[in-house]
Amino acid sequence: MNFKPLGQRVLVERLEEDTKTASGIIIPDNAKEKPLMGTVKALSEEVAKEGLLKAGSQVVFAKYSGTDVKLEGKEYLILKVEDLLGTIE
């Protein structure tokens, strides 16, 4: 993929959510909540210079943030850095 975010933005791929409950009930796609965690796939030059994030970082983000995009058949989220709540190590 050759996508480069602009400004203070990052491209994030959401982490997959379980499709089954612990008791084995299958959850349909329309009943699942989208996960609020993901992996940074690309970041702007501005964000890279700050050194706080890098490609591969796992992040937590605000519920109603970002713009959904589809690139090369995969779904991603373009987020402003200010919408990121933290990283997972």
UniProtKB/Swiss-Prot annotation:
GO BP annotation list: chaperone cofactor-dependent protein refolding
Cellular location(s): Cytoplasm
Gene3D superfamilies cross-referenced by the UniProt entry: GroES chaperonin
GO cellular component, as recorded: cytoplasm
UniProt main location, coarse: cytoplasm
InterPro entries: Chaperonin_GroES, Chaperonin_GroES_sf, GroES-like_sf
GO molecular function, one term: ATP binding
Presence of keyword Lipid biosynthesis: no
Domain of life according to the entry: Bacteria
Name of one Pfam family that matches: Cpn10
Record keywords: Chaperone, Cytoplasm
Assembly behavior: Heptamer of 7 subunits arranged in a ring. Interacts with the chaperonin GroEL.
Function of the protein: Together with the chaperonin GroEL, plays an essential role in assisting protein folding. The GroEL-GroES system forms a nano-cage that allows encapsulation of the non-native substrate proteins and provides a physical environment optimized to promote and accelerate protein folding. GroES binds to the apical surface of the GroEL ring, thereby capping the opening of the GroEL channel.
Membership in a protein family: Belongs to the GroES chaperonin family.
Protein name: Co-chaperonin GroES
Organism of origin: Wolinella succinogenes (strain ATCC 29543 / DSM 1740 / CCUG 13145 / JCM 31913 / LMG 7466 / NCTC 11488 / FDC 602W) (Vibrio succinogenes)
